[in-house]
């Protein structure tokens, strides 16, 4: 599913909302998640999961073609941990 499909589904399920308003809401939700993570905050959506930032230390990697050692800089990467409700649903354990 892509963002436009999500917007369409939400708009279809909420006929009292205009599609452009749904689009603004969805975009705002994503922007707020991105902003919080940019500040190093964790974003938890109960039952769905939690978005957080993991820090990777600098390390020495290898160029796969040449085998030459390469310095890999420290970096921050997004991380998502699924919530119990989502995990259970994916594994067919719905209530």
UniProtKB/Swiss-Prot annotation:
- What's in the GO CC field? chromosome; cytosol
Q: What do we know about how this protein assembles, alone or with others?
A: Heterodimer of an alpha and a beta chain.
Q: Name one GO biological process term.
A: regulation of translation
Q: State the function annotated in the UniProt record.
A: This protein is one of the two subunits of integration host factor, a specific DNA-binding protein that functions in genetic recombination as well as in transcriptional and translational control.
> Entry's InterPro entries?
Hist_DNA-bd, Histone-like_DNA-bd_CS, IHF-like_DNA-bd_dom_sf, IHF_beta
Annotated GO MF terms:
DNA binding; structural constituent of chromatin
User: Pfam families this protein is in?
Assistant: Bac_DNA_binding
Q: Which family does it belong to?
A: Belongs to the bacterial histone-like protein family.
Q: Which SMART domains match?
A: BHL
List keywords of the entry alphabetically.
DNA recombination, DNA-binding, Transcription, Transcription regulation, Translation regulation
This protein's source sits in the domain of life called Bacteria
Report what the protein is called. Integration host factor subunit beta
